[in-house]
Structures are given as structure tokens and as C-alpha cells.
Amino acid sequence: MLKHIKFIDNHGSFCVNRPENTSYLYFPLASEAGLKSSVTPVLGGDSKIDQDTFLLEPVSSENLHNNRSSRNFWIVKEGHIPYSVTGSSAQQEANRFTDRQEDSELTAGFMWQTLKRTSRELGFISTVTSFIPKSDNVEIMYVTVENQTDTVQKFTAYGAIPVYGRSADNIRDHRNVTSMLHRIETTEHGINVCPTMSFDERGHQPNHKIYYVNGCSGKGENPISYYPTVEDFIGEGGTYTHPRTVYEGYKGVPAHSLAAGKEAMGAFCFSSFTLAPGEKTDFILLSGIADSKEEIENIFEKYNTSDKVKNALEETRIYWKKQVNVDFHTQDPDFDSYMKWISFQPFLRRLFGCSFLPHHDYGRGGRGWRDLWQDCLSLLILDPKEVRSMILNSFAGVRFDGTNATI
């Protein structure tokens, strides 16, 4: 795998050409507040806080190439078929491994990634930057579109993120029944989903979590039309990679509409726009989990312009760089950069544990004493201030006879 990676700085940042051609590739994103995500080169993966609180449908490694359910952003150029800036359309997938496959590049660092795609056929370049601010439970997609032709082009844009909104247990246990608990509303900024109850092995519990997808232009302009359920968005006979709504231009519902009892969709349409030669525009998608509508509104106000998002991205990059404060200097610069990621692993272990990445899908989020002790050993070098409390808190949970020490 390393032969495909080109390291681009001294902090482990790298780029990969046509990353969608690499199987089982995904990237971790997380905050210190609890939100944990995995994101693939075509923006598959999932997002969650814990076993019982999944924003996006839970995935394991085999789901990475099986699932169509993924984060997406569609651009429709006037007079042409729709285009996915994530590469997740039926047409773009069919073009893969042929001379019609478009150029793409993934650039990534600690807790952020940027996907760049070039459509020669449609004459524009798009980028999607994904990250989670260190202190908030919101995943941010920052999308840019730049006209590369010599003529003015007209476009329409759609944000589209399926909202799972419940426990991982419900993937096969009461999947249909729990969708009937969904209470969905459209707001000025997007879609909120608040199931009436959680329904898992703990029993029937009243639910207060709100799963949401908000969107705006880089200038803070709201969507104009909304698609709050999967059926609304994909249409009769449609799929996530070939949604009838986008292909046939169906109009959605207005803000302040209600839906219930169906699989939820965080999808909306923006006002059409034109780009002069060389002109660029941008959009922001915010997806997350909150305890109140006020919290969602505060998050939106915090990240509703391109400048705010760029500042948050820079803060996120600086924060995680500072955490990995060990440098390596050998005769092989690539090895030195690779070792930065080895040093970053204990932080990922602390945040994700054994249960919340596609190849680490065992258990329900718990970590045994052996795991915690191994993490503490490496953190003694990287973050010694926190290790004493981690050891004391971990020992406090071990039974006197040691019978739960590795559970």
C-alpha cells in the first residue's frame, strides 16, 4: 500500500491518486466530544457516538463495497446527466477501470481528508473536505465547484446523506419497526430526525437524541427544497446512486414540513447558480447528533460560512498535529512519515476502542484492561498528563478477583 502513497509534508499528510481503485480504504474522523466516523474515498462509511446512537447506517469492512448508502453531493449541469462529486453515481462507477474514468485524488492528514475530482466531460473540478471539529459532535463536508471551461455554466446542487438514526442492534433486529418510530421535520437549514423511542436489548426507552443534516452555501444561503425520506429522494425505482429525484428534477417539500414512520433522508436542493470561466462556489453540509434543537441551531451558526469552516479545519489540523509530538528521523523519509501514523494510533484507540471502525467491529464499545494498559504505555510518551487518571479510572472498574480484567 505504501507504494501508492505520496507523503507531502513532515506531519504524515499524504495523497493517493484514484483512491477509489483501492479496496477497503477508509479514513477515521473523530472529535473529543464523542462523534466517531469512518469515511471512504467515495464518502461511504458510518458515523456514531456509541453502539446505541448511530447517525449513519453501521458498516463493517464488507459493507464498504456493498453499500450504496453513503454521503453524497450531486451537481446537475444544465443539459447533462447528474454528477456526484464523491464519485458515487451509477455512471461514474460504470466508468471505473475504463478510459472514461475521471481523475481523482485523495489528500489527508490527522482527522481530515480532501477528495478532488476532475470531470473533463463536464468541465469542472470539485473538492470535498471532510472533518469533525475537536469539540463538537458534527461532521462537516465542505464542497467546492470550479468552472474549468471558457464559457458560463449553469448548475443545480443537491446534498444527500441517508440518516439511520438509531442503535446498531436494529440493523437486522426490528429494522422496519424502528423506522416507524422516526419523526422527521424539515427546517430552514435541513432535516431533523427524532425517533420517539429507542428499541434495543435495554428495552423500550424514550428517545431525546436528534439526528440531523443541515446545509447551506458558503455564504450561508439555505436550501430551497427538501427530501426528508428515502422514498422522497430516490423516487419510485430509484437508488442512492441513481436517484430519480435528481435525474428528473422532482421538487421536494418546503421547510417546516413533517414526515413520520419511514427511513429518513438528509437531502435538499439549492438554488441554481452560474459560474463564469474560472469562477468557484462552495457549499457546507453539517451532519450530527444533538440533544436539542437549540444545540443544532448553535452548531449551524458556528459553521454556516466558508470562512468559519476553513478556520475550524485549520484549528482541527493544528490540534491533532500537536497531539502527535514525536518525530522520527531516519534515512527513509517515507518511513518517518509512516511512523507519525503509528504514533497517532493510540489516540485513535482511545477514541474508537475495538468496536467502531469497519475492520474493528467486535464488541459494543468496551475495552479490556490489557487494551487500556497497552494504550497507556504509548501515551506515557505522547500525552503523559492524562495517563495517571486513565490508569486509576481503569483499575477502579476491575473486580477484586480480576474476573473482568480482559472484558
What name fits each language-model region?
Residues M1-W373, I381-F400, A405:
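Anionic coordination/interaction segments
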